[in-house]
């Protein structure tokens, strides 16, 4: 019986590895025996549709979730603010990375929320997707096309594709997806990409505010977290929560569950300071130090980046920056290693052209942030 169980496990593993390759054959059989259909793969009108749950995905850090594409586990308690508990359904930072021999690719998705856009962020960024291809000559991911959406019932697009070219698909920033499917030619295969040249296979985890979340760029690939991932060739997890990144102790527990290569803490925008008259519960003096100490205790060897408040556009020196700089100096004096400090002066170009509203970055502002955060992560990882 033991050998039988081992054989069964091997067969299941092999079946999972070749699920797309065998789909055409399986769907032929399914015409005559519905019990032989491959779950999650359907061929209609000359397109083989593969459910996103079968595709290689990055940016999805937890399996014990309420919905498959959630960013946090179902067990998040009321000790974490309601904004986080609501926006955990957003798919910011999630992406599919694969290679296929199909000559055309189709994409269809159904958004989680009915609201597709904001007054300062278009539907293409809030609820759309975008596609990149890897250019072997330059060694860079190059933008291909944006999947735009105008109907809350869902959207679909198709593009030509060069077989064998690695593909990256970024999911929506300020919305989630109820359903996602990739369409390829009936006999095409889809495979996960190989190891990264950077050698970094564990994700860089970003925890922060609306700016980390992706507000307010034009499309998902322009969120600075996604840019950093492409530029440094590292996987990323985006735990930015608009208006809600306040470093509750429980959130440090959730971050510590992730087997990360680096943590980036960028929450000051949403936090207050007792020195400035803030109320209790959302301020740096109460929350920051217990949070970072617990994270380091749970993950002692993982580098941490402490980012100042990127308020070049919205104010000068503030009590929050002063506090975390003093905390950083104290931790270094205690002997902490692998701790990187990112000052706000590195983050922006120094004028308002990089924003949509004086605070939230547009695409240009996101590129400036990506250079700053990318530099800090590069230093933390020794790249």
Segments from the language model and where they lie:
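Catalytic nucleophile-elbow at a beta strand-turn-alpha helix junction centered on a G-D-S/GDSL motif
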Residues: 201-225
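Residues at the starts of beta-strands that form the adenosine-phosphate
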Residues: 203, 235, 302-303
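Surface-exposed cleft-lining segments at the edges of enzyme active sites
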Residues: 210-215, 237-243, 269-282
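Intrinsically disordered, low-complexity acidic regions
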Residues: 213, 218, 234-237, 247-250, ...
């Amino acid at each position: 019986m033991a050998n039988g169980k081992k054989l069964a496990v091997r067969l299941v593993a092999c079946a999972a590895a070749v699920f797309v390759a065998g789909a055409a054959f399986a769907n032929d059989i399914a015409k005559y025996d519905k019990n032989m259909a491959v779950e999650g793969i359907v061929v209609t009108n000359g397109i083989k549709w593969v459910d996103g749950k079968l595709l290689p995905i990055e940016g999805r850090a937890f399996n014990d979730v309420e919905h498959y594409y959630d960013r946090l586990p179902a067990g998040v308690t009321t000790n974490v603010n309601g904004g986080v508990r609501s926006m955990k359904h957003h798919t910011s930072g999630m992406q599919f990375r694969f290679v296929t021999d199909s000559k055309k690719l189709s994409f269809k998705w159904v958004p989680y929320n009915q609201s597709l856009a904001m007054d300062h962020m278009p539907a293409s960024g809030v609820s759309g997707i975008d596609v990149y291809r890897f250019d072997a000559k330059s060694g860079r991911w190059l933008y291909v096309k944006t999947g735009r959406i105008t109907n809350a019932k869902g959207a679909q697009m198709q593009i030509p594709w060069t077989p064998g070219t690695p593909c990256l698909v970024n999911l929506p920033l300020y919305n989630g997806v109820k359903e996602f499917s990739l369409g390829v030619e009936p006999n095409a295969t889809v495979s996960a990409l190989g190891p990264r040249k950077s050698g970094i296979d564990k994700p860089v985890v970003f925890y922060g505010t609306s700016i980390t979340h992706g507000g307010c760029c034009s499309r998902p690939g322009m969120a600075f977290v996604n840019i950093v991932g492409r530029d440094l060739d590292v996987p990323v997890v985006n735990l930015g929560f608009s208006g809600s990144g306040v470093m509750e102790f429980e959130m440090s527990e959730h971050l510590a569950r992730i087997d990360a290569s680096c943590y980036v803490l960028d929450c000051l925008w949403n936090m207050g300071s007792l020195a400035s008259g803030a109320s209790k519960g959302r301020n740096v003096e109460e929350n920051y130090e217990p949070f970072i100490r617990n994270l380091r205790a749970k993950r002692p060897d993982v580098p941490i980046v402490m980012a100042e408040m990127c308020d070049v556009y919205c104010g000068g020196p503030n009590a929050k920056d002063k506090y975390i700089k003093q905390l950083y100096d104290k931790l270094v004096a205690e002997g902490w290693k692998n701790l990187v400090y990112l000052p706000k002066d590195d983050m922006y170009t120094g004028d308002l052209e990089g924003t949509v509203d004086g605070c939230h970055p547009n695409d240009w502002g996101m590129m400036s942030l990506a250079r700053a955060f990318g530099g800090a992560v590069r230093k933390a990882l020794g790249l």
